[in-house]
Amino acid sequence: MARFPEAEARLFNVKICMRCNARNPMKARVCRKCGYKGLRPKSKERKGR
């Protein structure tokens, strides 16, 4: 997807909050924006294609 491994790491090494869709660091346990504990890793591939 990204041209460089560094760029890909920057884009995909995050967790997404299931409540507010905020981006959080991989080491996060709760969302930085709303405090929700339900975080998922960002998808590496597009959905439905």
Curated annotation (Swiss-Prot):
Signal peptide region: none
GO annotation, cellular component aspect: ribonucleoprotein complex; ribosome
InterPro entries assigned: Ribosomal_eL40_arc, Ribosomal_eL40_dom, Ribosomal_eL40_sf, Ribosomal_zn-bd
Gene Ontology MF terms in the entry: structural constituent of ribosome
Keyword entries, A-Z: Ribonucleoprotein, Ribosomal protein
One BP annotation, GO: translation
Tree of life domain: Archaea
Record flagged with keyword Electron transport: no
Family that this chain belongs to: Belongs to the eukaryotic ribosomal protein eL40 family.
Entry protein name: Large ribosomal subunit protein eL40
Species of origin: Archaeoglobus fulgidus (strain ATCC 49558 / DSM 4304 / JCM 9628 / NBRC 100126 / VC-16)
